[in-house]
């Protein structure tokens, strides 16, 4: 496993379920094409599984 993940919001949260919107917000993403770095751990991976269709993930 890599130490960090680079997460980019690639699809809009308009029309998604409220739980998915909160997950995207919890990841620190607000705007389209915004990128954040998060630690690679089980909690982050779980959140990414819930919104995999909205984000792209790159291991760094």
From Swiss-Prot:
**What is the protein name for this chain?**
Large ribosomal subunit protein uL30
Q: Which organism is it from?
A: Lysinibacillus sphaericus (strain C3-41)
Disulfide bonds listed in the record: none
The subunit field of the Swiss-Prot or TrEMBL record says: Part of the 50S ribosomal subunit.
Q: List the lineage, top down.
A: Bacteria, Bacillati, Bacillota, Bacilli, Bacillales
| Alphabetized SUPFAM superfamilies for the sequence | Ribosomal protein L30p/L7e
A single Gene Ontology CC term: cytosolic large ribosomal subunit
Pfam families listed in its UniProt record = Ribosomal_L30
> What does the record list as GO biological process?
translation
Task: Extract the CDD domains matched here.
Answer: Ribosomal_L30
Key word Transmembrane helix present in the record? no
